[in-house]
Design a protein with these regions (language model features):
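Membrane transport/envelope proteins' first extracytoplasmic loop
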Residues: 2-276
């Protein structure tokens, strides 16, 4: 005589449980769907932002680093620095550092007083660059790039924080400029005035672009900053650090031999305005 197969009691119980308390299970289901959707969306958005940032490095010609000299370098010194070779005295043995050839670009600026509400009082510091197509380009977010000596394009983040808009008139060290556009420089993801600053300041510090004629209107001292790009792009942060150390030794030796002085040295990997 064959045994009677015992049915699993859960077959009937589970559907009854769900139907009897469907509101609770609906809430749990919706919670899981929304959570999974939210987390997945964050990952997709993060990947998209990282891709855009990586593309921006090449599209807007981001520097591999920059240094500042006390005096403007002549063409002979520029060529010597670009060679990446360490300058040694005749009686000294050659350095052990590797030759690190680079291309240099002038990236001069002035730190001026900003009066964004034109009330005659200083509201902060504005770092003014000339319009260039060689290195550290700016993305135009609104308006237009400056076209004449009386126009200026300012950082979009700073403008949003202080209520500045396209068409406003601001004063830069007492001289009036019309805001032609809002921009974002590729080397200023955040508004760090100095590499030693622990936190950026998007209210008291601004970066801006003017024409060459507009730059000549200003009076504060020029910072002779040179941005560089390696001829052979480093594969990772470790190689970037090694190249930076070798280039620093070579650059300093050439600058000292020319009777000039290094005021600042900031490779890209240690620049908080880029990597914050």
């Amino acid at each position: 005589m064959s045994r009677k197969k015992i049915k699993n009691p859960l077959i009937k119980r589970i559907p009854k449980e769900i139907i009897g308390d469907w509101k609770k299970y609906l809430v749990v289901f919706l919670f899981l769907v929304l959570t999974i959707g939210f987390v997945s969306g964050m990952y997709v958005a993060n990947d998209s932002m990282l891709t855009s940032a990586d593309e921006g490095v090449s599209k807007y010609k981001q520097e591999d680093g920059h240094f500042e000299l006390k005096d403007k370098a002549d063409s002979e010194l520029v060529t010597a620095i670009e060679s990446g070779e360490v300058k040694t005295a005749p009686d000294e043995k050659d350095s052990d550092s590797s030759k690190t050839p680079v291309t240099l670009y002038e990236n001069f600026y002035r730190n001026e007083d900003e009066d964004y509400d034109a009330d005659g009082k200083k509201d902060g510091t504005i770092r003014v660059y000339t319009k260039t197509g060689d290195i550290n380009l700016a993305c135009l977010i609104e308006g237009s790039f400056p076209q004449n000596e009386n126009e200026i394009a300012v950082d979009r983040m700073h403008a949003d924080n202080v209520g500045m808009k396209v068409g406003d008139t601001i004063k830069v060290s007492g001289k009036e400029f019309k805001v032609s556009g809002l921009i974002a420089y590729v080397n200023y993801s955040t508004l760090h005035e100095k590499k030693t600053d622990m936190m950026f300041d998007a209210i008291k510090f601004d970066v801006a672009m003017v024409t060459k004629e507009g730059f000549d209107r200003l009076d504060k001292s020029i910072h002779y900053t040179y941005a560089w790009k390696y001829e052979d792009e480093p594969a990772d942060d470790i190689e970037q650090k090694e190249k930076s150390d070798d280039f620093l030794e070579a650059m300093v030796s050439q600058v000292m031999a020319a009777g000039n002085e290094v005021e600042d040295y900031t490779p890209r990997y240690s620049n908080p305005a880029i990597n914050f």
